Amino acid sequence: MATKKEEVKFEDNLAELENIVRKLESGDVALEDAIAEFQKGMKISETLKKTLNEAEQTLVQIVGKDDNESEFSAEQKEY
């Protein structure tokens, strides 16, 4: 399960990525700076994607456990 520190880090990274996108969309960034910001944004994007994939896997495991427990409980009630 994610700790509070990990959640804040995810939110901070997401906010930073949104800030980069706004800068690039504004068009007020020099080419060299735009390239650097784009590269930074891509790295942040990969980090966010990894975090989301890990969270998804955790949820799949939890749901899988809950399904097994539910089936077990239903079987007990039939007896």
Curated annotation (Swiss-Prot):
GO-annotated biological processes: DNA catabolic process
NCBIfam families (UniProt xref): PRK00977.1-2, xseB
Taxonomic source organism: Lactococcus lactis subsp. cremoris (strain SK11)
SUPFAM superfamilies in the record: XseB-like (SSF116842)
Lineage: superkingdom: Bacteria
Protein name (Swiss-Prot/TrEMBL): Exodeoxyribonuclease 7 small subunit
Quaternary structure and interacting proteins, as annotated: Heterooligomer composed of large and small subunits.
Catalysed conversion reaction: Exonucleolytic cleavage in either 5'- to 3'- or 3'- to 5'-direction to yield nucleoside 5'-phosphates
GO cellular component: cytosol; exodeoxyribonuclease VII complex
Pfam entry (one): Exonuc_VII_S
